[in-house]
Amino acid sequence: MMILVTILCYFAVLLLIARITGRKGGSNAAFFKGENQSPWYIVSFGMIGASISGVTFVSVPGMVRGMDMTYMQTVLGFFFGYMVVAHILLPLYYKLNLTSIYGYLGTRIGVRAYRTGSFFFLLSRMLGTAAKLYLVCLILHTYVFQEMHVPFWLIAVGSVALVWIYTHKSEIKTIVWTDTLQTFCLIAALIFIIYFTIQRLDLNFSGIVQTIQNSEHSRIFVFDDWVSRQNFFKQFFSGIFIVIVMTGLDQDMMQKNLSCRNLQEAQKNMYCYGFSFIPLNFLFLCLGILLIALAGQMQLELPAMNDDILPMFAAQGYLGQSVLVLFTIGIIAAAFSNSDSALTAMTTSVCVDLLNTEKDTEETARRKRSKVHLSLSVLLAFFICLVEILNNKSVIDAIYIIASYTYGPLLGMFAFGLFTRRQTNDRWVPLIAILSPLICYLADWWIGKETGYKFGYELLMLNGTLTFAGLICMSKKGKTLKVP
């Protein structure tokens, strides 16, 4: 009952924020870009929660057991990726005054490239958001609501409905402020869970440092194994490109940046936001080491799945009942902050890129937007329930793989537009964008079978390179399309 009351109180605060921030809004410009009035420091803080999903909240501490602290190599790459986004992509988006960032592809390459970029974003975001929300709903069902005999589908529908309620009228500026609250709750939950873990271990500060340093899982850098997915250069450069495509080429993440007052504030937001990932992910990994140490001290058998380590400690009371409340708040905050912005960004992409509502009257555009927002919410709930019906871990993995593969063509198309002075044949763009991920999948399967080499995130770079090469092959020298 305490968990249910916590969730209801949390949602009530979200509704209050939505009501306050949406009081003077309602226009399409406000919904899509917040009338360019969002304070950069609020956007920066809130974007942390939007990037850290519920999956991250439970997965990063657990991944320590399987790959030590080598994830920090990727996190370091993230920071340099954010610098690329701040100094190459953000100036472009502000110069063109874009609502949807894929409008650049239409201006630079052609209408089919524009539609293709938007389609790949929608596919990736819908599948990725459904998979993330599924795992969060599953955790809530297993550890919180199962005793109340609440069916999974009701949790899924309820979660999406809650997000729809406070986003369907309240615009991107509401998302900016609700994400700020949710980021605060997420970070507070993480810090308090670490605190209770340290209490159980009965450690002072020097003891904490010593426990982490002496752990067999404290390794961060891997320079000596080129085959391993944890090799430094694979992880570091993959981190750079992951940020470029999953932040810089993602409507969800860029929409908040475009709601800032000007380019300079958006860049400051990106600097602070990018740097904050380093200490935050380090804390998640340290929590993982401390939980493993606590399991050894208490002689507990850890679950087979790494993702179940933190939920086990929280749900079974090993850290006290307060941690279960904190864990629930952290999961809900991470899930909502990721899903609300994704739903708003998908609505923007469908309305602006596919339905071209910017040419409609204000009232017509608003009606279309409301219908699209509701339809996408229903579709999201359907996909979450579909994954539950299939109930197959390999299906969830496949969804993540498909979602990640769809960013490669976006990388290739934007790279072609930014770094070449050629015009490609626009009608071939959809085919090239489809073939590139398929070739990557076959290459991953064949090379793994023949040589044992394991592709990691570098598949993203290969995918983008293939798309880039395909566009080059279908292009000719000449003047580029005129870009404002």
Task: Give the label of every model feature segment.
Residues M1-P484:
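Membrane-embedded helix-loop-helix hairpins and adjacent transmembrane boundary segments
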